[in-house]
């Protein structure tokens, strides 16, 4: 039977100093011997998804204490991708994932914590904490801050007024539309983000919080209960109770089934990806799941994702893939248990797998899917939680309820497999000479008439250069915009291309152009936007050899992406490039890169493996220097 890790610092004569310090933090004599639960909070006033988490961690801590554990809270950093977008700050977003993982590892191991609650929410925080949880492999529960309410705006059109829902992406697109007045833009800006919480569409943050629920490390409702709703308080209380129970099962009963590596198995990764494909989640989720699989030592790669995308249909289209639905609507339709229920009934997920709350996937669906004949009353109650319609930066600030649930599986927010939006899933992996190791596209956000596309390349050496080109009308209808040297090493940091895609839409080019990059996309991106092209330009990928005017052909049904240039010409270009530049680097790009970012680039791997860190790259260099 494993001993409590915390005994290292709470027991033995020689640990008197450690106990003295713990006493100074409020730990009493009778607490020594109880499981110490690290509460990894990510509260910050910079990020709307995290601005309310100070109070949230207190609720978790109180629940841990009531269940017989000793809570110890600490903080991690949290980068807001939306604020960091469109300037040099975006270079730091993806690298922050590794910093967060390291910070959690450092704190938990330095203080010998027995279990972990991850209070996360936004884009890189949940993935960073997931990497740490898999690395540490101690009893862990994830509980996020919850999604933001969708914005609502009154649009004046002559004498008529209509109210429509919107989110962060709307003012971004409008800012590039010359037909939108400053007054209209200001109205959109003020209405887009009305409350605390992760941005209201199926963007990266909400996608990842839904996936932690599907993979089995979070509680029912984690991905969809609104940040402002009182119903979310029960989630935090339950997280505190469950983590102490999991710690007891492991340390007192030697039950390894509660450990992250026992839950996040290859089959669990497949379940999570099936959900992702079904709901048309952010392409960033592919990056993070691949990195998590690498951390867990799980054999799960792009080929597995490609196979799932061909087998699992798209059951849910939420902003930015649809103007009609946001996360609050997914919640009204039953949230993640409802989507998992539809997949389970079609035999598309493994229902035998364990989850941290003690149920199998099948039991979770049976109890929490509102379409199940055995649904629990508390599940029905939970999914009635609705937006409050008032500006708020506080957790638990409203308790509005829907008057009815969305049970329409034919044309509602969540559809059955029989009535799916498309028989293929909402994400796809493309391969070809332009991306032999793979590239990814969110098909749920692409109109089907664009699933095959061919056009001349318009090449840019950076995101900034591309933005200038789009706004200055250098990009024309039919072009394939190529943005390169923005990969994990080439950026470094693999910037998101939300501004280029938003500005293409703002200029009316969103449905007549394609965009390909070795960088990545925000979860708010839609349109024919293909990212993660691997190998990246900085690693010698053929994307470095594309020239203006080259024809690029995209064929989503056949999962191909082809640079229509003969191989001998590509080889000649490669030789010329190496002779001219001495390596694969952008021409005439002026970009300050700090030592911290250079350190990240030195250890970053390809997007095809999740841009996971590989320390051996540095170790090999050191050994051979």
From Swiss-Prot:
Keyword Phosphoprotein belongs to the record: no
Residue list for modification N6-carboxylysine: 124
GO CC terms, sorted: cytosol
Superkingdom of the organism of origin: Bacteria
GO biological process per UniProt: isoleucine biosynthetic process; L-valine biosynthetic process
Regions crossing the membrane: none
Binding residues annotated for [2Fe-2S] cluster, in chain numbering: 122, 199
The record's free-text note on cofactor binding: Binds 1 [2Fe-2S] cluster per subunit. This cluster acts as a Lewis acid cofactor.
InterPro entries reported in the protein's UniProt record: Dihydro-acid_dehy_C, DihydroxyA_deHydtase, DiOHA_6PGluconate_deHydtase_CS, ILV_EDD_C, ILV_EDD_N, IlvD/EDD_N
MF GO annotations: 2 iron, 2 sulfur cluster binding; dihydroxy-acid dehydratase activity; magnesium ion binding
Keywords for the protein's UniProt record, in alphabetical order: 2Fe-2S, Amino-acid biosynthesis, Branched-chain amino acid biosynthesis, Iron, Iron-sulfur, Lyase, Magnesium, Metal-binding
EC number: 4.2.1.9
Active site: 522
Binding site for Mg(2+): 81, 123-124, 496
Cofactor: [2Fe-2S] cluster; Mg(2+)
Xref: Pfam families: ILV_EDD_C, ILVD_EDD_N
Reaction equation(s) it catalyzes: (2R)-2,3-dihydroxy-3-methylbutanoate = 3-methyl-2-oxobutanoate + H2O; (2R,3R)-2,3-dihydroxy-3-methylpentanoate = (S)-3-methyl-2-oxopentanoate + H2O
Pathway: Amino-acid biosynthesis; L-isoleucine biosynthesis; L-isoleucine from 2-oxobutanoate: step 3/4; Amino-acid biosynthesis; L-valine biosynthesis; L-valine from pyruvate: step 3/4
Record family assignment: Belongs to the IlvD/Edd family.
Known partners and oligomeric status: Homodimer.
Function description: Functions in the biosynthesis of branched-chain amino acids. Catalyzes the dehydration of (2R,3R)-2,3-dihydroxy-3-methylpentanoate (2,3-dihydroxy-3-methylvalerate) into 2-oxo-3-methylpentanoate (2-oxo-3-methylvalerate) and of (2R)-2,3-dihydroxy-3-methylbutanoate (2,3-dihydroxyisovalerate) into 2-oxo-3-methylbutanoate (2-oxoisovalerate), the penultimate precursor to L-isoleucine and L-valine, respectively.
Record protein name field: Dihydroxy-acid dehydratase
Lineage of source species: Bacteria, Bacillati, Actinomycetota, Actinomycetes, Streptosporangiales
Gene: ilvD
């Amino acid at each position: 039977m494993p001993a409590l890790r915390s005994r290292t610092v709470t027991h033995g004569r020689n640990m008197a100093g450690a106990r003295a310090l713990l006493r100074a933090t409020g730990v009493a004599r009778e607490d020594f011997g109880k499981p110490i639960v690290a509460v990894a909070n990510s509260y910050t006033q910079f990020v709307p998804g995290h601005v309310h988490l100070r109070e949230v961690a207190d609720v978790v801590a109180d629940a841990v204490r009531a269940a017989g554990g000793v809570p110890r809270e600490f903080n991690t950093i949290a980068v807001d991708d939306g604020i960091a977008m469109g300037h040099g700050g975006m270079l730091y977003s993806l690298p922050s994932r590794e910093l967060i993982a390291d910070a959690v590892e450092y704190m938990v191991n330095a203080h010998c914590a027995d279990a972990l609650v991850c209070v996360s929410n936004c884009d890189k925080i949940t993935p960073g904490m997931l990497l740490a949880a898999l690395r540490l492999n101690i009893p862990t529960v994830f509980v996020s801050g919850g999604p933001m309410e969708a914005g609502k705006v009154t649009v004046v059109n002559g004498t008529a007024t209509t109210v429509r829902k919107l989110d962060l992406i709307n003012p971004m697109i409008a800012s590039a539309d010359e037909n939108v007045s400053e007054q209209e833009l200001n109205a959109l800006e003020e209405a887009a983000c009305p409350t605390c919480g992760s941005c209201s569409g199926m963007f990266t943050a909400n996608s990842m919080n839904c996936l932690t629920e599907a993979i089995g490390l979070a509680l029912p409702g984690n991905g969809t209960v609104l940040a402002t709703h009182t119903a979310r308080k029960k989630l935090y209380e339950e997280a505190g109770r469950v983590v102490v129970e999991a710690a007891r099962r492991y340390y007192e009963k030697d039950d390894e089934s509660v450990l992250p590596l026992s839950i996040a198995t290859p089959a669990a990764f497949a379940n999570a990806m099936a959900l992702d494909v079904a709901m048309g989640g952010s392409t960033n989720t592919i990056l993070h799941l691949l990195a998590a699989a690498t951390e867990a030592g799980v054999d799960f790669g792009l080929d597995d994702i490609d196979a799932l995308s061909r087998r699992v249909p798209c059951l849910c289209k939420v902003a930015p893939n649809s103007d009609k639905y946001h996360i609050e609507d997914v919640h009204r339709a039953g949230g993640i248990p409802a989507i998992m229920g539809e997949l389970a009934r079609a035999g598309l997920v493994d229902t035998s797998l364990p989850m941290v709350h003690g149920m199998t996937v099948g039991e979770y669906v049976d109890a929490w899917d509102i379409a199940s004949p055995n649904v629990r009353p508390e599940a029905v109650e939970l999914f009635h939680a609705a937006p409050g319609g008032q500006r708020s930066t506080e957790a638990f600030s409203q308790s509005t309820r829907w008057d009815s649930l969305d049970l329409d599986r034919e044309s509602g927010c969540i559809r059955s497999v029989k009535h799916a939006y498309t028989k293929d899933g909402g994400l796809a992996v493309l391969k070809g000479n332009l991306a032999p190791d793979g590239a990814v596209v969110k098909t749920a956000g692409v109109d089907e008439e664009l699933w095959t596309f061919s056009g001349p390349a318009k090449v840019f050496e950076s995101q900034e250069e591309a933005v200038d080109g789009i706004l200055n009308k250098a990009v024309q209808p039919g072009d394939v915009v190529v943005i390169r040297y923005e990969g994990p090493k080439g950026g470094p940091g693999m910037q998101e291309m939300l501004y280029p895609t938003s500005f293409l839409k703002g200029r009316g080019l969103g449905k007549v152009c394609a965009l390909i990059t070795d960088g990545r996309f925000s979860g708010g991106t839609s349109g024919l936007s293909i990212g993660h092209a691997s190998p990246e330009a900085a690693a010698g990928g053929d994307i470095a050899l594309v020239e203006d005017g080259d024809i690029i052909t995209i064929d989503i049904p056949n999962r191909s992406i082809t640079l229509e240039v003969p191989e001998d010409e590509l080889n000649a270009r490669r030789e010329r490039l190496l002779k001219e530049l001495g390596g694969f680097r952008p021409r005439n790009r002026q970009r300050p890169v700090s030592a911290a970012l250079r350190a990240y680039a030195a250890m970053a791997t390809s997007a095809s493996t999740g841009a996971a860190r590989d320390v051996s790259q540095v170790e090999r260099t050191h050994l051979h220097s």
